[in-house]
C-alpha cells in the first residue's frame, strides 16, 4: 500500500471534517436529547435533584465519554483499521488467525450491535418529536402522545421507504446540518452555564465517584444505565472509520465532544436554576427560550433522521460483511448509489422498520424506550475489547500491557453492563431476544458451513483430465454448452468437490468446449478484485480463483467476462467463433452456470446435532437469496442440480429376495 494512500487516510481536511460530522456522530450527537431527561426522571423529577446529584451526573458523563469514547475508541480502536475499514467484523478479520474461538465474540458483538441499533431510530425520532410539547401553539396537540407516535411513524415510513432509491441526494446535507446542530449544542449550552459556572467543577472525577456511593443517588450503581446513554454511539464511530478516514475523526472529535459536554452542562445549569419551578418538560428543550423551540425541534428532528440514516446504512454494511465472511445467510444486495459503499438490503431494511415501528408502538414514549436502550451495546463493547486485546498483541504490544489495558476497559464496560441489566425487565428483554435470534442464525450458518467442509469428499481434477477430454471430443453426445461453469466453495490446489465431477461425468455427461471451475475467496482487504488462472496444461479446463474483498459484490459473470477476454488476448484460450450471432466478430461462446445444491442425506455419519444444524440451515435458506442472485446470475443460463450432502458413503440397507413357493419346494 502506497504512502500516499496512508497519508490521505490519516490526513484531515475541511471537507472531511464536515463529512465526518454528518456520518460518524449522528448517534452520539443526539444523545443530549434524552440522556439528562432519563437521569432526572429516574431520580423522581426536576424538583427531586440536588446540586451534588447534578454535579455527579455531569462528572460521570464527562468521564464516560473520556474513558470509553476518547481513549478506547478514538485513541486505541481507530488504529485497528483493516485496510482503512473499521468495525467489529473488520477487527475480527485482523485477528481471526490467532484463535478459532474469536468467531464467537465477533458474532455476539455483531448481533448485539444490530439488535440494539434497531432502537436508535425509535428513541431519537420520538425524543425529537416530543419536543413539540414545549413549542407554543403546538403543545396542546402533542400533549396527546398518540399524535407524537403518529408523527414518528410517518417519519420512519418515509425514512425506510427511500432507502431503495439511495440516499446520496440527501447525504450531501448531512454534514452541514450536523455542523449547525453541534454548534447549537455548544452555544446554547455555554449560555445556559453562565449563571452557574460552578457546574464546571464536574470535570473533577471526585464528584462522579461520590455520587455512585451517595445516599442522594436513589438508584445506586444502576444510575450508570442512564449515564451510558451518552456514549452508545462510540461503537458506530469506529464502524464508520472507512467512510471518513482516521485523520478527520481525530480532528472532529474534540469539537464534537466539547459541544456535547457544553450541552450537558447547560442542561444541568438550567435544572439547578429551575428545580423548584415544577416544569416537567425535557431539560433539553426547556432550557431553550420558548420562541426558539420550534426551530430547535425542526433541527433536532433532522439530526435524529441523520442519526437513524447512519444506523440503517451501518446495518446494511454490517450484514453485508457478515454474509461475505460466511457467518450470515445470503440476502439480495443492491447498489442504488454511484459507489459500492452505498448498498441496500431489502429484507434487512424492512426487518429494521418492523422492529423500530413495533418499538414505538409498544413503548410509546421516549422515556420508556430509554429504559430498554443501551443494554445490548454494552455487550458489543465488551466483545470489541476482547478482539482489541488480540490485536494489540499481534501488533507487538507486550502481552502483559495488552491484558492490563483491556482488562481495565472490560471492567468498566462490565460495570455498565451490570448497571444496564436492570433494563432487561423494563423492555431490554426484547433487544436481548432479538440479539439471541441473530446469534442463533449466525451460529447455524457458520456451523453448517463447517459440517459441509467436514463431510464432502474431494477428488483430484488431474485424475479426470483424460476423461473430460474424451467427453469434449465425443460427438455421440450433443454439445451441452460452449462453456460450462461450476462454482465451488472448496477448491484447494487441484482438489475439487466430488459432486462437481459427478455432475460432469455421471449424472448427465456434459459435453462442452471449455470447463470452468471457479472459486470465490473473500479477502481481509475490503476492496480487492484479483484473480488467478490455471489452464492445467490444457485449453479446455480452466481453474479460476477470484479474490474479492469483503465489501465487493460477488457478481461472477462480470469478472468472468474480463478473464475470458484476457485469456483469449494472451492466446491461452482459443477463440470461440460464433456461426450465428447479431454481434459481428463475436469470438466468445455461450455460457451455462451449473449450481450444485447439497441436501442432507440419510447417511449415518451425521450426528443428531449435525443433522439439526443442517436441517435448520436448509429451512433458513428458504427465505434467503438464492446463489443465482448472490453471484449475479439472474440474466445467465443456470442449471440447478441437487445432490446428497454425503456422497462418500452409500449405505447398503439389508434386503432379501422372496423365493417363489414352487421353487422352494423343488
Curated annotation (Swiss-Prot):
Claim: Ion transport is one of the keywords in the record: yes
UniProt keyword ATP-binding, yes or no: no
One Gene Ontology MF term: symporter activity
Membrane topology label: Multi-pass membrane protein
InterPro entries hit by this protein: K+_transporter, K_trans_C, K_trans_N, Kup
Function: Transport of potassium into the cell. Likely operates as a K(+):H(+) symporter.
Stored HAMAP family: Kup (MF_01522)
Name of the protein this chain belongs to: Probable potassium transport system protein Kup
Provenance organism: Streptococcus pyogenes serotype M2 (strain MGAS10270)
Amino acid at each position: 500500500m502506497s504512502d500516499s494512500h496512508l497519508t490521505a487516510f490519516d490526513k484531515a481536511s475541511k471537507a472531511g471534517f464536515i463529512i465526518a460530522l454528518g456520518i460518524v456522530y449522528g448517534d452520539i450527537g443526539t444523545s443530549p436529547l434524552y440522556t439528562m431527561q432519563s437521569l432526572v426522571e429516574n431520580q423522581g423529577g426536576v424538583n427531586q435533584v440536588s446540586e451534588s446529584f447534578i454535579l455527579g451526573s455531569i462528572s460521570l458523563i464527562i468521564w464516560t465519554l473520556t474513558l470509553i469514547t476518547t481513549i478506547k475508541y478514538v485513541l486505541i480502536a481507530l488504529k485497528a483499521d483493516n485496510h482503512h475499514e473499521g468495525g467489529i467484523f473488520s477487527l475480527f478479520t485482523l485477528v481471526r488467525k490467532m484463535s478459532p474461538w474469536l468467531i464467537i465474540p465477533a458474532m455476539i458483538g455483531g448481533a448485539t450491535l444490530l439488535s440494539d441499533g434497531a432502537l436508535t431510530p425509535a428513541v431519537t425520532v420520538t425524543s425529537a418529536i416530543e419536543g413539540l410539547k414545549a413549542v407554543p401553539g403546538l403543545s396542546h396537540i402533542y400533549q396527546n402522545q398518540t399524535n407524537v407516535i403518529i408523527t414518528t411513524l410517518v417519519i420512519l415510513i418515509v425514512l425506510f421507504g427511500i432507502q431503495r432509491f439511495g440516499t446520496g441526494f440527501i447525504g450531501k446535507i448531512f454534514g452541514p446540518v450536523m455542523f449547525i446542530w453541534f454548534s447549537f449544542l455548544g452555544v446554547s449550552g455555554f449560555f445556559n452555564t453562565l449563571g452557574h459556572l460552578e457546574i464546571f467543577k464536574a470535570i473533577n472525577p471526585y464528584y462522579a465517584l461520590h455520587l455512585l456511593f451517595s445516599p442522594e443517588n436513589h438508584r445506586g450503581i444502576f444510575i450508570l444505565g442512564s449515564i451510558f446513554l451518552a456514549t452508545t454511539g462510540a461503537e458506530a464511530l469506529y464502524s464508520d472509520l472507512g467512510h471518513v478516514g482516521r485523520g478527520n475523526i481525530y480532528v472532529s472529535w474534540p469539537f464534537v465532544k466539547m459541544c456535547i459536554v457544553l450541552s450537558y452542562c447547560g442542561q444541568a445549569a438550567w435544572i439547578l436554576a429551575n428545580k423548584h419551578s415544577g416544569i416537567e418538560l425535557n431539560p433539553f428543550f426547556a432550557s431553550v427560550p420558548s420562541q426558539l423551540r420550534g426551530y430547535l425541534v425542526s433541527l433536532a428532528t433532522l439530526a435524529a433522521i441523520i442519526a437513524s440514516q447512519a444506523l440503517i446504512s451501518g446495518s446494511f454494511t454490517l450484514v453485508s460483511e457478515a454474509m461475505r465472511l460466511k457467518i450470515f445467510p445470503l440476502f439480495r444486495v443492491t447498489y442504488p448509489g454511484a459507489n459500492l459503499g452505498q448498498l441496500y438490503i431489502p429484507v434487512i431494511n424492512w426487518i429494521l422498520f418492523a422492529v423500530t415501528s413495533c418499538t414505538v408502538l409498544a413503548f410509546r414514549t421516549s422515556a420508556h424506550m430509554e429504559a430498554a436502550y443501551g443494554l445490548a451495546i454494552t455487550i458489543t463493547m465488551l466483545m470489541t475489547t476482547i478482539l482489541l486485546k488480540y490485536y494489540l498483541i499481534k501488533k507487538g504490544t507486550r502481552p502483559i500491557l495488552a491484558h492490563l489495558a483491556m482488562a481495565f476497559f472490560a471492567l468498566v464496560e462490565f460495570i455498565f453492563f451490570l448497571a444496564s441489566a436492570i433494563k432487561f425487565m423494563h423492555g431490554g428483554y426484547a433487544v436481548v431476544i432479538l440479539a439471541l435470534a441473530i446469534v442463533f442464525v449466525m451460529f447455524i450458518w457458520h456451523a453448517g458451513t463447517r459440517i459441509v467442509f467436514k463431510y464432502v469428499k474431494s477428488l483430484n481434477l488431474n485424475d479426470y483430465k483424460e476423461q473430460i477430454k474424451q467427453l469434449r471430443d465425443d460427438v455421440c453426445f450433443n454439445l451441452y454448452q460452449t462453456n460450462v461453469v461450476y462454482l465451488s466453495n472448496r477448491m484447494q490446489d487441484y482438489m475439487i468437490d466430488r459432486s462437481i465431477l459427478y455432475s460432469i461425468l455421471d449424472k448427465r455427461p456434459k459435453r462442452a468446449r471449455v470447463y470452468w471451475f471457479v472459486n470465490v475467496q473473500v479477502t481481509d482487504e475490503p476492496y480487492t478484485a484479483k484473480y488467478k488462472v490455471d489452464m492445467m496444461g490444457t485449453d479446455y479446463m480452466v481453474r479460476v480463483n477470484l479474490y474479492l474483498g469483503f465489501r465487493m459484490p460477488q457478481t461472477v459473470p462480470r469478472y468472468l467476462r474480463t478473464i475470458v477476454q484476457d485469456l483469449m488476448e494472451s492466446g491461452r484460450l482459443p477463440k470461440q467463433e460464433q456461426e450465428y450471432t447479431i454481434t459481428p466478430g463475436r469470438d466468445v461462446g455461450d455460457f451455462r452456470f451449473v449450481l450444485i445444491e447439497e441436501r442432507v442425506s440419510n447417511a449415518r455419519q451425521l450426528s443428531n446435532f449435525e443433522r439439526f444444524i443442517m436441517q435448520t440451515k436448509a429451512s433458513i435458506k428458504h427465505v434467503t437469496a438464492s446463489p443465482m442472485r448472490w453471484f449475479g446470475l439472474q440474466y445467465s443460463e443456470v442449471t440447478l442440480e441437487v445432490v446428497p450432502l454425503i456422497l462418500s458413503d452409500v449405505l447398503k440397507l439389508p434386503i432379501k429376495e422372496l423365493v417363489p413357493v414352487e421353487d422352494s419346494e423343488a
